[in-house]
């Protein structure tokens, strides 16, 4: 019923509004075009065109079929190339999760541009997660690869890891915060008076990591690092921020960095992927990272540059 020639005929008639013009486009006779459309209407049991002596126009059913037919025909035309890609070991879908600390719209766009040019028939899905939520996606939610899992050792022996670097932290507050000009290391008693600004771990199955907060201290949860930094600048609260994300603000005297009794150690992050079952797209992404190619440099900027 919906063979490629019939679909092309139907689309041509719909686009030209004429059997004769469709015949010219397809190098067929008008009678052949008319017969194909009549047969299609008989097989579907509905009228697809309103006919006048000079032109034809789509019925409601015809308009619906047109929107579907173009997609079907494009799918049929691309199928040989898609099948060859699958036969060559290329995945039909690749799910990639990115740690919130490494996430950058520009970095994702750069990687997607590179991937889409090489694997036009693969569906790519990116997700942004926080702390153990990155491992959670990889372990339990069908993700193929993770950019920025915590640590340098896998949580299961079915994964491979490539260390990316360690995030350095600074304890900050706004320049006009009451603690900003206190001399010497701050005490817990002094810190406890002000809210800790944190981003909640997005893990759903694994145990969530608890961000810095003293017993009895008020905590304010925000959705991302951009909001956290904005809250610090507004004097809402205090807390740790990656050094490359706040150093420029510290240099401008918009934020102040202080020492507290327990400073946060560097946070090592790694690339992680499944040992078995991966395809060529994942293999190529891994190569980009292990070889530190420019296409993925945006994900690693937090380890070696200052940005605000």
From Swiss-Prot:
The keyword DNA-binding applies. Keywords: Activator, DNA-binding, Transcription, Transcription regulation. Residues 19-38 bind DNA. GO terms for molecular function: DNA binding; DNA-binding transcription factor activity. PANTHER family: HTH-TYPE TRANSCRIPTIONAL ACTIVATOR ALLS (PTHR30579:SF0), TRANSCRIPTIONAL REGULATOR (PTHR30579). The keyword Transcription regulation applies. InterPro entries: LTTR, LysR_subst-bd, Tscrpt_reg_HTH_LysR, WH-like_DNA-bd_sf, WH_DNA-bd_sf. Residues 2-59 form the HTH lysR-type domain. It comes from Salmonella typhimurium (strain LT2 / SGSC1412 / ATCC 700720). The gene is allS. Belongs to the LysR transcriptional regulatory family. Positive regulator essential for the expression of allD operon. Binds to the allD promoter. This is HTH-type transcriptional activator AllS. One of its GO terms (biological process) is regulation of DNA-templated transcription.
